[in-house]
Amino acid sequence: MTPADVEAMIKKIADGQSEKLNWQQSIVDLMKLLKLDSSFTARKQLAQELGYKGSLDGSAEMNIWLHKEVMTKLAESGGVVPESLKHA
């Protein structure tokens, strides 16, 4: 699945929600749409599990990196949320 396919799939999910989320830029909103725990603790744990090497302080850098990684993992798994993202 291409990144464009993933974006189209997520947009379709977002369009069906009453709450308007900024999933294109916000890892918290993206995780909410995917029904993943978007808490700070969960994001820190997921960043560690995915190999983030920077500070785990919830910085914009960490969140941007994590957003990119989640989108990549979705593309690699054919648009299905992989188990590795669910348990964080």
Located regions from the model:
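Amphipathic alpha-helical interaction segments
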Residues: 1-88
